[in-house]
């Protein structure tokens, strides 16, 4: 029976716990589509006490009957992707459902070298890139000089497509950044080898999705990073090079907006950010250390410590608006268990005035001071709670406050990394467009 096509997006700066929520929802999905980003994003899934860290491959790969498609809007590092496939095989996970869009762009060795060299040259003006070559790959895509997955399947086409860009990048690496040039033949042979291994998984992205839609399959679109890292709608220039927002699903997967039935946002019960850029609710000292330790706040991709802060309702409301969120999944509520009081940012002060919107200027955003409301903590463990009735009253009050502040119902509450540490308030795919936990 046809149920729904759903987009899952991050409602903050990424690292919200989308991997767990997507894993949960993938049980009801026939097709899971990753629609943007590359190996600069990571998600962690815990299965039978095994911790699996993925960067490119969708969480749905854990379900043998689910098709997992890496869409046209992604940028693919084939070496990393094949490493993930080998890791999954070693863990006895069936990878036959994996599909890779023929039109996805490929991260080449010079993209990584340029990314790292440019970030180093920026010095104090660095933007916090992961150094994985994502920005340069997307730049080549925009300049129509990129290499696509389909090019790896034909030696002559790869040679023809690579000749000009590689010569240009070698000159740039040598002349501007003092980096040794790449050998063309070595690169060609390496990437032809990747192409041979990936060939059985390569498909036409749009055709695959629309066939699934015609067959009335349930399709789950999985975004990477988060709303505030969106190239057009985030805290520019401290953003990624793609569009993690819900609208990016249509572009990156090759579907029209009428195919999307529901948009689910994922947000932590507090806020984190990796890398540079303004962060109004950022904490320091012992509180920051406590959230970092209890939340395990280190990046899946880079290992960098995440910056921690109180929940920011201003960016939360903005995420609801930009993405058209129908409901919200709140993760890591358990991280707040030991606090005697919890603060929530409800507005900003900018130049002496109260504002309740997200400013478009990064300079203005850096000057914003948070206006907080303080709520009581619950100072007891929520990790074993499996229903709303199990939650302590202050925790319920906190969730209701967030739902009211963001003007969106909460459908899922996560209380730990394991699949069973989850409260489903209403089924966000099968149920009506509402949730029980709302103001």
From Swiss-Prot:
GO BP field: 'de novo' AMP biosynthetic process; IMP metabolic process
Catalytic activity from the UniProt record: IMP + L-aspartate + GTP = N(6)-(1,2-dicarboxyethyl)-AMP + GDP + phosphate + 2 H(+)
EC numbers on record: 6.3.4.4
Keywords: Cytoplasm, GTP-binding, Ligase, Magnesium, Metal-binding, Nucleotide-binding, Purine biosynthesis
One cellular component term from this protein's GO annotations in UniProt: cytoplasm
GO molecular function annotations of the record: adenylosuccinate synthase activity; GTP binding; magnesium ion binding
Cofactor annotation remark: Binds 1 Mg(2+) ion per subunit.
Subcellular location: Cytoplasm
Pathway membership: Purine metabolism; AMP biosynthesis via de novo pathway; AMP from IMP: step 1/2
Pfam families per the UniProt record, alphabetical: Adenylsucc_synt
Binding locations of substrate: 300-306
Keyword flag Repeat: no
Group of enzyme by EC: ligase
Chief localisation class: cytoplasm
Superkingdom in the source lineage: Bacteria
Cofactor names: Mg(2+)
HAMAP family attached to this UniProt entry: Adenylosucc_synth (MF_00011)
Similarity comment text for this entry: Belongs to the adenylosuccinate synthetase family.
Functional summary from the UniProt entry: Plays an important role in the de novo pathway of purine nucleotide biosynthesis. Catalyzes the first committed step in the biosynthesis of AMP from IMP.
Listed NCBIfam families: PRK01117.1 (NF002223), purA (TIGR00184)
Name of the protein in its database record: Adenylosuccinate synthetase
Species assigned in the record: Synechococcus sp. (strain CC9605)
């Amino acid at each position: 029976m046809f149920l729904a096509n759903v987009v899952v997006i991050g409602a903050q700066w990424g690292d919200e716990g989308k991997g767990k929520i997507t894993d949960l929802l993938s049980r009801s999905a026939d097709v899971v589509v990753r629609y943007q980003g590359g190996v600069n994003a990571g998600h962690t899934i815990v299965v039978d006490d095994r911790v699996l860290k993925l960067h490119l491959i969708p969480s749905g790969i854990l379900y043998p009957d689910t098709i997992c498609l890496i869409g046209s809007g992604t940028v693919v590092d084939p070496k990393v992707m094949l490493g993930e496939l080998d890791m999954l095989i070693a863990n006895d996970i069936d990878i036959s459902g994996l599909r890779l869009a023929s039109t996805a762009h490929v991260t080449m060795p010079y993209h990584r070298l340029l990314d790292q060299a440019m970030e180093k040259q920026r010095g104090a003006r660095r933007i916090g890139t992961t150094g994985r070559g994502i920005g340069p790959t997307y730049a080549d895509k925009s300049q129509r000089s990129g290499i696509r997955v389909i090019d790896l399947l034909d030696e002559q086409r790869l040679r023809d497509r690579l000749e000009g860009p590689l010569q240009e990048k070698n000159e740039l690496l040598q002349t501007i950044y003092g980096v040794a040039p790449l050998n063309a033949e070595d690169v060609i042979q390496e990437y032809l080898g990747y192409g041979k291994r990936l060939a059985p998984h390569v498909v036409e992205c749009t055709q695959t999705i629309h066939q699934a839609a015609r067959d009335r399959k349930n399709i789950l679109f999985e975004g990477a990073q988060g709303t505030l890292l969106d190239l057009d709608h985030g805290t520019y220039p401290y953003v990624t090079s793609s569009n993690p927002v819900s609208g990016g699903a249509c572009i990156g997967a090759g579907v029209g907006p009428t195919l999307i039935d529901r948009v689910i946002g994922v947000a932590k019960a507090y806020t984190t950010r990796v890398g540079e850029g303004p962060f109004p609710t950022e904490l320091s000292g012992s509180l920051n250390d406590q959230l970092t330790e209890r939340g395990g706040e280190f990046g899946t991709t880079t290992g960098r410590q995440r910056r921690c802060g109180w929940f920011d309702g201003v960016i939360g409301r903005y995420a609801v608006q930009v993405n058209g969120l129908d409901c919200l999944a709140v993760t890591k509520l358990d991280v707040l268990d030991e606090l005697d009081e919890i603060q929530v940012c409800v507005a900003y002060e900018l130049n002496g005035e109260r504002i309740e919107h997200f400013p478009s200027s990064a300079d203005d955003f850096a000057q914003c001071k948070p206006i907080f409301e303080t709520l009581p903590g619950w100072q007891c463990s929520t990790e074993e709670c499996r229903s709303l009735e199990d939650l302590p009253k202050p925790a319920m009050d906190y969730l209701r406050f967030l739902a009211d502040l963001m003007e969106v119902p909460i459908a899922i509450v996560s209380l730990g990394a394991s699949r069973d540490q989850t409260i489903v308030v209403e089924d966000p795919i099968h149920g009506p467009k509402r949730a029980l936990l709302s103001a």
